Curated annotation (Swiss-Prot):
Summary of subunit composition and partner proteins: Part of the 50S ribosomal subunit.
Role noted for this protein: This protein binds to the 23S rRNA, and is important in its secondary structure. It is located near the subunit interface in the base of the L7/L12 stalk, and near the tRNA binding site of the peptidyltransferase center.
Superkingdom to which the source organism belongs: Archaea
The protein's name: Large ribosomal subunit protein uL6
PANTHER family per UniProt: 60S RIBOSOMAL PROTEIN L9, 60S/50S RIBOSOMAL PROTEIN L6/L9
Source species of the chain: Methanococcoides burtonii (strain DSM 6242 / NBRC 107633 / OCM 468 / ACE-M)
Length: 177
């Protein structure tokens, strides 16, 4: 007989969670995070100060999705309470880079002496602060913050050169919650 898979997540103080029509919303001091969560055979319930993610089936896919949804929900609640922050370092040897935030775009000028600026997208409600040789990417959605930092790092990737010698770029040096 198949056994039921059940994960219980406690809701921290100051966070309100609602689940209606397969959309989970978590509100806290930093803002509101919403996410569409639906998978066949996986149920989500909000009961008072806890969230129950369960599945009547113990198949591999349902078990994996219960764990995935549990992680997504805990990250949503961490984001609205503490937020996520990535620290990045600007490294150059000969040509000094000029970096600036222009609306929802992150602009890198004079990378390796290039005339054309490199432009990276800032996703969602993520904020980017550039000062000197440090870039701070912060927000309440872990996926948007991480993808924005990765986009910036990838825009300064040097192709067809040895990365041990040509180390110019913008690199992630620290991740904080």
């Amino acid at each position: 007989m198949a056994k039921e898979i059940k994960k219980i997540i406690s809701i921290p103080e100051g966070v309100t969670v609602t689940f209606e029509k397969n959309v989970l919303s978590a509100s806290g001091p930093k803002g509101t995070n919403t996410r569409f969560l639906w998978y066949p055979g996986v149920n989500i319930e909000v009961n008072g100060s806890e969230i129950i993610v369960d599945s009547a089936s113990s198949r591999k896919k349902q078990k994996a999705m219960v764990g995935t949804y549990t992680s997504h929900i805990t990250n949503m609640m961490k984001g609205v309470v503490d937020g996520f922050e990535y620290h990045m370092k600007v490294v150059y040897s000969h040509f000094p880079m000029q970096i600036k935030v222009n609306g929802k775009k992150f602009v890198i000028n004079n990378f390796l002496g290039e005339k054309k600026p490199r432009v990276s997208n800032i996703l969602g409600e993520t904020s980017v602060k550039a000062s000197g040789d440090e870039v701070i990417v912060s927000g309440i959605n872990k996926e948007d913050v991480g993808q924005t930092a990765a986009n910036i790092e990838q825009k300064t990737k040097i192709k067809r050169f040895d990365p041990r010698v040509f180390q110019d770029g913008i690199y992630i040096v620290d991740k904080r919650v």
